[in-house]
Amino acid sequence: MRSKKMTGGLEKAPHRSLLYALGLSKDEVNRPLIGICNAANEIIPGHVHLHTITRAVKDGVRLAGGVPMEFPAIGVCDGLAMNHTGMRYSLPSREIIADSIEIMATAHPFDALVLIPNCDKIVPGMLMAALRLNIPTIVISGGPMLAGRKDGKKVDLITVFEGVGQVKTGNMTEDELTVLEQSACPTCGSCSGMFTANSMNCLSETIGLALPGNGTIPAVMAERTRLAKAAGSQIMTLLEKDIKPRDIVTEKSLKNAVTMDMALGCSTNTVLHLPAIFNEAGLKLDLTVFDEISRNTPNLCKLSPAGPDHIEDLNAAGGIQGVMAELSKTGRIELDPMTVTGKTVGENLKELNAGVKDHKIVRPVDDPYSTEGGIAVLFGNIAEDGCVVKQSAVAPEMMKRTCNAKVFNSEEEAVEAILGNQIVKGDAVVILYEGPKGGPGMREMLTPTSAIAGMGLGADVALITDGRFSGGTRGAAIGHVSPEAASGGAIGLVQTGDVIEIDIPGRSINVKLDEAEMEKRRAEFKPIEKEMPSAFLKRYSQNVTSASTGAIYKK
């Protein structure tokens, strides 16, 4: 066992003495030691209940003969960090989480790991660590929040963000907004739509590093606790069979992940996280792969923000296994990859008798919402390395549109202009210097996109940025523009008054300038150098790569 590095032999008597100080018995010291990484804290609604999940995991480990040993992980709530300097720390926290788990599991050589995340950057950070360490590992998330209810309709956090814009336009009173904000998030759990956290939890299940049900069983259900107990027991089986993350994460599981990403209509943040995760397994996933698979994958779901349904509805409709079964009817799912059940994807689908139970929530594969996937990748003279848009959440009027650029050098400047009624129909709000390097930290632009939607401009105004978006963003929100402005990217050459041509079906985005004018501006262009708010963010800015490669660290 790996733990024998610290428990076995004469020379390890001092190590055993320290373990006895924890209250362990001699029998426990000689059993498999299972690291339990618990990301619980009291500030994130998606993590406030993870101690309950952790207790169930520990029970499962003990039932199967192991010794659970808990250690913590940090986490950032993107909703609470939104629209202030705290958002600069969200994406960088992904690398810190991966690094800290590597440190803990190497300094203390556990035999296996159970990872307990739930929200946006914690899930990919833990998956990156799992593949980097490559010891038997299983992921069990905290589960999604239930949707709220107001006036007989389902509401969620994005409803509140958009409510701010509605108040600004006089379409909602502040008293109504107060009722809404107290109704939208009724339980613990990751925010209830197909936002980033739930996107990543669903894809963890798809990839095979989490048990069936992990992506969709609500946080408040007893079934979630039972799943956690099962995960604790199953890690002992994975240890016994020596099934490791890189046995599970292969080229075929990569294809499954991107296919499900497109069918479900997941967050554009998956285009950052999946390349970073697969990179740890030595697999390359670039934007062209996303686009190729998107063109050949039907979009079967329109969950919030694209539609009125939520993760609880997807769970009742058959969950992730149901969607995979539906896609497998046309050969779009690889059935061979191993999973943490100890069985292949195909064996899981057969054993569970998986299928879609409600075709109002998950459309039939031969009658999809669209014949293409939820995310499109665009290229052009302002995005030579690409940019992304959640096309499943774009109004038909904005799929192909010519817009007038209004350029801002920060999110704050753009929000002030939007809420100050300076943006009109036909505009493209262009926000520069919000990329991984230039932000630094690649902040989410949920506040400006929600303001645009809430003010009734979602079908007439685009937002283009080298920053990124919340999974709750809807509308013509085109992000991850690469190269970013801070790296000298052509997006930085765009000026207010320029005409931008957006063609999502044609996969292009261009500023309408001749090459001579582009070269003239390029020769005169000097990227703005921001004063770094901290030494940590300065180090991050110096070491992070482009959004087009997953915003991972330089080698």
Curated annotation (Swiss-Prot):
Q: Which UniProt keywords apply?
A: 2Fe-2S, Amino-acid biosynthesis, Branched-chain amino acid biosynthesis, Iron, Iron-sulfur, Lyase, Magnesium, Metal-binding
Residues holding [2Fe-2S] cluster: 119, 191
- Give residues where N6-carboxylysine occurs: 121
**Could you provide one GO biological process annotation from this protein's UniProt record?**
L-valine biosynthetic process
Q: Which Gene Ontology terms cover its molecular function?
A: 2 iron, 2 sulfur cluster binding; dihydroxy-acid dehydratase activity; magnesium ion binding
Protein name, UniProt field: Dihydroxy-acid dehydratase
Residues the record lists as binding Mg(2+)? 78, 120-121, 444
- What EC number(s) does the entry state? 4.2.1.9
Q: In which pathway does it act?
A: Amino-acid biosynthesis; L-isoleucine biosynthesis; L-isoleucine from 2-oxobutanoate: step 3/4; Amino-acid biosynthesis; L-valine biosynthesis; L-valine from pyruvate: step 3/4
What reaction does this catalyse? Answer: (2R)-2,3-dihydroxy-3-methylbutanoate = 3-methyl-2-oxobutanoate + H2O; (2R,3R)-2,3-dihydroxy-3-methylpentanoate = (S)-3-methyl-2-oxopentanoate + H2O
One Pfam family recorded for the sequence? ILVD_EDD_N
Cofactors that this protein relies on: [2Fe-2S] cluster; Mg(2+)
Q: Which organism is it from?
A: Maridesulfovibrio salexigens (strain ATCC 14822 / DSM 2638 / NCIMB 8403 / VKM B-1763) (Desulfovibrio salexigens)
> Would you identify the family this protein belongs to, as annotated?
Belongs to the IlvD/Edd family.
- Parts of the chain that traverse the membrane: none
A GO cellular-component term linked to this record: cytosol
Q: What class of enzyme is it?
A: lyase
Which catalytic residues are annotated?
470
- Is-annotated flag, keyword Cell membrane? no
InterPro entries to which the protein is assigned, alphabetical: Dihydro-acid_dehy_C (IPR042096), DihydroxyA_deHydtase (IPR004404), DiOHA_6PGluconate_deHydtase_CS (IPR020558), ILV_EDD_C (IPR056740), ILV_EDD_N (IPR000581), IlvD/EDD_N (IPR037237)
